[in-house]
């Protein structure tokens, strides 16, 4: 048996509907679309959320919130990713050099996910309570 010789069991798959192929098929001429109207045309149909000209729900409801610009340049760093960084001092630039963070990131926060075995010094980064405890338990320290 080879992958290129596999085929489904006989009768398990039905043939696709072939529309517009003559009267005898039952789907000739208008091909199941009916007569005239927007939905019978090529490319016909309305966009998602269109309500026939009535003011759509999306516009009837009030706007709310905004996208924080700071959130776009902030990232979370897991404890296990700190192992990729060479050296004992970890700051924003060393994380970027180790390809843990992309170049556009300006703020980072270390979160407790995974473990860290070696002692490291974290400078100028935010750290969660759990991550702080794990870093200090490994013999490291956090400098603001």
UniProtKB/Swiss-Prot annotation:
Q: Which GO terms describe its cellular component?
A: cytosolic large ribosomal subunit
Question: Recorded GO terms, molecular function?
Answer: rRNA binding; structural constituent of ribosome
Which Gene3D superfamilies does the UniProt record give?
3.100.10.10
Name the source's superkingdom.
Bacteria
Q: Which key words are in the record?
A: Ribonucleoprotein, Ribosomal protein, RNA-binding, rRNA-binding
Where is the stretch described as Disordered? 1-49
Q: Where is the signal peptide?
A: none
Matches recorded under Pfam families: Ribosomal_L27A
Give the GO biological process terms. translation
Composition bias (Gly residues) maps to 21-31
Q: Which family does it belong to?
A: Belongs to the universal ribosomal protein uL15 family.
Chain's role: Binds to the 23S rRNA.
Cite the record's note on assembly: Part of the 50S ribosomal subunit.
Which NCBIfam families does the UniProt entry name for this protein?
Answer: rplO_bact
- Record-given protein name: Large ribosomal subunit protein uL15
- Specify the taxonomic lineage: Bacteria, Pseudomonadati, Pseudomonadota, Gammaproteobacteria, Alteromonadales
């Amino acid at each position: 048996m080879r992958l290129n010789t596999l085929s489904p069991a006989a009768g398990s798959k039905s043939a696709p509907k072939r529309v517009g192929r003559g009267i005898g098929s039952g789907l000739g001429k208008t091909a199941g679309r009916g007569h005239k109207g927007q939905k019978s045309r090529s490319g016909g149909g309305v966009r998602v959320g269109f309500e026939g000209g009535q003011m759509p729900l999306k516009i009837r409801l009030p706007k709310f919130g905004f996208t924080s610009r700071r959130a776009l340049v902030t990232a979370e760093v897991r404890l296990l990713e700190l192992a990729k960084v060479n050296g004992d001092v970890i700051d924003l630039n060393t994380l970027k050099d180790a390809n843990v963070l992309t170049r556009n990131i300006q703020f980072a926060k270390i979160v407790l996910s995974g473990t860290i075995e070696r002692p490291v010094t974290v400078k100028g980064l935010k750290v969660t309570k759990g991550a702080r405890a794990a870093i200090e338990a490994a013999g490291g320290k956090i400098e603001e």
